[in-house]
Curated annotation (Swiss-Prot):
GO terms for molecular function: RNA binding. Its main location: nucleus. The gene is VIRMA. The modification N-acetylalanine is found at residue 2. The lineage of its organism: Eukaryota, Metazoa, Chordata, Craniata, Vertebrata. It is found in: Nucleus speckle; Nucleus, Nucleoplasm; Cytoplasm. Belongs to the vir family. Residues 234-266, 274-302 have a biased composition (Acidic residues). One of its GO terms (cellular component) is nucleus. It comes from the Eukaryota. Associated component of the WMM complex, a complex that mediates N6-methyladenosine (m6A) methylation of RNAs, a modification that plays a role in the efficiency of mRNA splicing and RNA processing. Acts as a key regulator of m6A methylation by promoting m6A methylation of mRNAs in the 3'-UTR near the stop codon: recruits the catalytic core components METTL3 and METTL14, thereby guiding m6A methylation at specific sites. GO terms for biological process: mRNA processing; RNA splicing. This is Protein virilizer homolog. The modification Asymmetric dimethylarginine is found at residues 1741, 1773, 1775, 1793. Residues 1803-1812 have a biased composition (Basic residues).
Amino acid sequence: MAVDSAMELLFLDTFKHPSAEQSSHIDVVRFPCVVYINEVRVIPPGVRAHSSLPDNRAYGETSPHTFQLDLFFNNVSKPSAPVFDRLGSLEYDENTSIIFRPNSKVNTDGLVLRGWYNCLTLAIYGSVDRVISHDRDSPPPPPPPPPPPQPQPSLKRNPKHADGEKEDQFNGSPPRPQPRGPRTPPGPPPPDDDEDDPVPLPVSGDKEEDAPHREDYFEPISPDRNSVPQEGQYSDEGEVEEEQQEEGEEDEDDVDVEEEEDEDEDDRRTVDSIPEEEEEDEEEEGEEDEEGEGDDGYEQISSDEDGIADLERETFKYPNFDVEYTAEDLASVPPMTYDPYDRELVPLLYFSCPYKTTFEIEISRMKDQGPDKENSGAIEASVKLTELLDLYREDRGAKWVTALEEIPSLIIKGLSYLQLKNTKQDSLGQLVDWTMQALNLQVALRQPIALNVRQLKAGTKLVSSLAECGAQGVTGLLQAGVISGLFELLFADHVSSSLKLNAFKALDSVISMTEGMEAFLRGRQNEKSGYQKLLELILLDQTVRVVTAGSAILQKCHFYEVLSEIKRLGDHLAEKTSSLPNHSEPDHDTDAGLERTNPEYENEVEASMDMDLLESSNISEGEIERLINLLEEVFHLMETAPHTMIQQPVKSFPTMARITGPPERDDPYPVLFRYLHSHHFLELVTLLLSIPVTSAHPGVLQATKDVLKFLAQSQKGLLFFMSEYEATNLLIRALCHFYDQDEEEGLQSDGVIDDAFALWLQDSTQTLQCITELFSHFQRCTASEETDHSDLLGTLHNLYLITFNPVGRSAVGHVFSLEKNLQSLITLMEYYSKEALGDSKSKKSVAYNYACILILVVVQSSSDVQMLEQHAASLLKLCKADENNAKLQELGKWLEPLKNLRFEINCIPNLIEYVKQNIDNLMTPEGVGLTTALRVLCNVACPPPPVEGQQKDLKWNLAVIQLFSAEGMDTFIRVLQKLNSILTQPWRLHVNMGTTLHRVTTISMARCTLTLLKTMLTELLRGGSFEFKDMRVPSALVTLHMLLCSIPLSGRLDSDEQKIQNDIIDILLTFTQGVNEKLTISEETLANNTWSLMLKEVLSSILKVPEGFFSGLILLSELLPLPLPMQTTQVIEPHDISVALNTRKLWSMHLHVQAKLLQEIVRSFSGTTCQPIQHMLRRICVQLCDLASPTALLIMRTVLDLIVEDLQSTSEDKEKQYTSQTTRLLALLDALASHKACKLAILHLINGTIKGDERYAEIFQDLLALVRSPGDSVIRQQCVEYVTSILQSLCDQDIALILPSSSEGSISELEQLSNSLPNKELMTSICDCLLATLANSESSYNCLLTCVRTMMFLAEHDYGLFHLKSSLRKNSSALHSLLKRVVSTFSKDTGELASSFLEFMRQILNSDTIGCCGDDNGLMEVEGAHTSRTMSINAAELKQLLQSKEESPENLFLELEKLVLEHSKDDDNLDSLLDSVVGLKQMLESSGDPLPLSDQDVEPVLSAPESLQNLFNNRTAYVLADVMDDQLKSMWFTPFQAEEIDTDLDLVKVDLIELSEKCCSDFDLHSELERSFLSEPSSPGRTKTTKGFKLGKHKHETFITSSGKSEYIEPAKRAHVVPPPRGRGRGGFGQGIRPHDIFRQRKQNTSRPPSMHVDDFVAAESKEVVPQDGIPPPKRPLKVSQKISSRGGFSGNRGGRGAFHSQNRFFTPPASKGNYSRREGTRGSSWSAQNTPRGNYNESRGGQSNFNRGPLPPLRPLSSTGYRPSPRDRASRGRGGLGPSWASANSGSGGSRGKFVSGGSGRGRHVRSFTR
């Protein structure tokens, strides 16, 4: 055959499919490099194909005589497309039609053939693209991963990700052996995981082996080939399966074939890890090992020569595969990671831009359609409009007014058409003239009565219509003076309110365009602006409707002005930043370095860094604060816009409440988006997130996030993001940058990206982009086109990939539940389920299966039931139509309660009845409808959170009445109880919350039930006229909180759990409203009201069971008010202060009734060695003491009693024994003494003035005696350090309830001191004790440092200094001893003691105003400065105190000077110390002879302290600051700090056998374990495991279970032989390790729950044990908490309280120390804050892991800076050492109180799952 000279024969071969009947077949031709295809020929039977072939292969064998052959090709110009493109079809007829020529020369590296043939001989002609083939030899560059469905040339695929994402494709076809030649399209995507009808995956099949080798005839290249085999199932199961194969293959060829090329590219990079796996995979699947030599062939190709290999080895022959994948194999595939970072937004399709007017949209639609598309509606409207304009050029009578009324309806279609077609005719100008005449009062007055009002109203409506005609319309109106015209109308006399409202509507339309707003705000020369005129109008005596309408316009103006101001600040920032000198960057880095290396000074460094940033950018803190306020204002205005910025309908009346009436009519958001667009708001936000000075500011981040989050909640907001797609792409990149940074550092960023908002926003916009593609696909495609179109499948596949991680899943659920988005999937399903398509064809369509899965995911994960209201009927109809589809049947179960349901108040009884009937099926596959029923009930009966300016809708009150009458309360309590009973068992065994679906269902049910209960109880108890004594509610809530919200300290509650905790707290707090103020309060009524009963339940639950300790304490802490004073930037009104104080008194009263329980709690936990519980106890004690004096005395008495009992428990004659219990009690007392209320209660009790409390004064003296003689035992040393720290708190006058303030009438200094310091007798003994400690050579370094700092506190005022001098007279050698010790032990580590001691001496020498803090600023200014001191010690007296007989102080100072000088060579920090030494030495040298201390001083007499009750009543309730101090705002309590404790000290011998016989004699361990581990917990979408499986064959659930996700709890038995996703996925497999045993050597990956280790499999195989679904077998204890969390402990958004706060500005997490080994060690050395691998399965399909519970080991010391209670602690004088030297690694530095004393931050242990 003649072949064109430019062409060569690329391929010639015969595909055979011997089969009894004719059916559709698919074959693949793969070229080893890129080729251009010019022609494809089908060789008829008997025709010689090629002259140079041997006879036995030279002739065509094609049969039958005619058939249609479809061809698809891999488009190499779109490397990222997930599907093959269609090449075309050949209607083959052996007599007439055998040649197919593509329309253009196609370059490709693979073809797919499909047709109803049994045998096909095919020749392909074309040319080789040498260049490209050369390129392909080297691996492609690694840019970002999976692209958006529209192929974008700019986006290349990241090989690292391409694979795993594809690997799982739909339902995740298993990681199959990839033949490197002719490719087999894998099977239909989301197959239904029907048990009875598993969809076969045509992965590969029996290749017809064609006779001898064929290498002799290939011309230039030899594409290896392999006919696509049929799986056994196909031929066995007849027609339906074949159709399914055909249908599946058809789109699969579309969807999947190219994927395999990507895998191949990856193979090149995976270095020899594959061959063995594939070989094993084959054998292990129990298939025949037919082709050993093939595998050898594989071994020879190494990754770097892959591209060339095929060209060189023309004889190379590929093995064929006949692998049948079972459901089990599918489930064992490691999860694919979906990397969203590559997907960029593209211009908006289908939907229109949210800020464009209807007129603008119509114009752009006409332009797009082009002039040829005749639009009859537009033509008619334009003709009519032209007629009207021509007809009434002069006439201004009744007909003209009628014409004016008709015009608005013609403008959109008619005027737009005229403007496009007939540009010369000035219709718009004429309309503007008419409008101005219609608004003219003079013209109106000439009209007959009634007609004149019609004319004015028609004029205002015409203004609104023309204002919508884009810039042209508004500009025309403005030039004609429309604003003045409208104001004339508004200011005119005798104009009715309704006409004024019309005028306001017109004005509103004008300012809704930015040009109009500019004109309105500016005004013309020498004329008031529209804004000023409007204010004047409102200030006149107007009706309420007119004022409301005017206010709405003012609100819009304010919004516009705020945006203008933000833009101004943004431009200013941009200019300053661009003009910055370059050197600012390196400075920043050095700071950061300093911060890392020296954790002790972290706070200072951070502050200096911020200052450097501020200075370098010339941006003042004030400007940043202003920016934050403006952003917050934007958020507030947008939130309230629907109630404050819309023009009310003329007939409505603004009232406080309404019961009926239309919903809000107007939508303010398009206008606001227009303003945002015109101010380039998204670009500004991106700028703020990119400039270091603003992006590092938590306030800016939080404010921007609030605005963005608000926008992303609505469809229009998302469309706004998409219409500004370029800015959005940059914005998301900037946000993700923070997310990455935080992961890098192992930190949780400050609340901005804490909830993966960046990913959620990205996934939401991507989802909507996919929806726009679906809609535009339906617009373009007609029904006659083939069903599974490649673009359509690409889009659906992308959507499906997004659902693979929890953030993406929630984003998909959210976006599909908005407006009509779900219709896109329903349309698809309705199209495929049409009978016209033929039953089997539609059911096997891939797109249909995708749509089923996606709709199911949306219904499961979205709580927004508005979409169900619209679509439930059509969805139920689809479920009914296809009864064989498991996905749809499951969907039917979810939608069951919606049959014939109207979403109105009347449906409440039916839904509650449904809940009652199904309560026993809770959390089972049959009971999923319960979740839907509860969601609908929430929607119908629970009001949305109130927004300022909103009318109260009384229909919600009616709904609550319905709930009560339908026995809702009882039903919901039963739901909670049932939920608790189901969750308790797995929770006790530390099992995670199950799969994503199980978790979503649990959280959703809990949230809905809690919301309903909250609504009912709030309504019931609000007035105080009802009492509610059903204690099942608090009891169920306490249990639920324990199960869902108690987590180990490294963890944080995620946003869902946080919301559940908030709901639980809110419900419990509603019980505090049920107190009738009018009742007289007696002991009895107090004990029996709802508040007390709720408290009793909560308090008794704390000690009920050990598992509830921690949760109970958190719950109590969350319920109690925060300690005062509040920090604020505004003065708080006296009324609000009294409310705050009264609330605390009420709490105190009700708690006092439960005094015994409170004491029991404090006593029980005081001795705990479990640090989290110790920490929570301290926190609760502080909160209780802060309420009022009775609770403060109660708690402090209890603590002091414990110390008394502990110290007196030893017999009298022996020396007192100090145990570790003593240290814990003193540590508790020390922690409490640093808080105001607790300290004053302690002082009150140890004064010894109250009858019956004398024992406390005695015990205090015992403690002072202990400090004087520390002894050498470690425990005594610890006790001494705690006692000195307690003394320091008692002597700090800043720890006081009444703070000195600069306001008039504030108390005098002496009164202040009398109320905050110990009395005269105590002060004397304390000073004696301090000096004795200094003189004692046994005192520890920390102890000395604390004592010196305490003396510095005392030296600030005459009262303290007087007592110090008195003690110095008694103990004159103390200062000398200390100086000597400082000199003799001086080193870099003890420099702090030397420095403090010198500072103290300088302080007592000096009688001027003391600024002992060095840098007395910050809060000091707020708190009020300390007044001057008159007393002092002169230099001669000091010289006397410092000398002894042996040596003079000058010599000691000289020696110290030498030492300091020597050390300062290495350490610059000692320079200032050197100056102090020299200065003091000179003062002493010049002072002359030493003199004894004078005793001439007058003793300052303090007034008697006020009673504790008075102090509480007059306490400082708030602290005013210029700028919010973020540390104080977010954290009132030191975050949990780990201390290293010598655990051996706390070991107690216990006889467990004896204990078990005594306490649990009837407990049968064997049966309990059997019950726990062999019973199957039910959960949605689970099937029971079959017992006694055969290896490799036991039934496992399919890869996508009922939820569309795999349960991944029970690992498949053969997981260790499945090849891993190549070169990507879970942390680099197969890199230099034995390829077939990756599981034994892998690191732990905490992005998913722990799966079984390979050794467990071996054990399981030998024992035939089935690990149960749901509860992992009790293997090694789980080592680390899998809850992916980050730093800072528990979050809390109730005023920054959670159990340990999310705000972590000053709390660095424990660093993870290297990698955790999977198998060694106990539960990890610390609860390290772990990094969430970005976006990939942190809650994994395999079930999100909850957190570990159980005994909590001591944590490693963390590096951080704690919160210091005293304002002056910020300054250098610091607090005493955190205390115990034994608790700190480097206690030499004596860090401040609450510091985490050891540092070290390192990368967390995750290998990053994604690379950017």
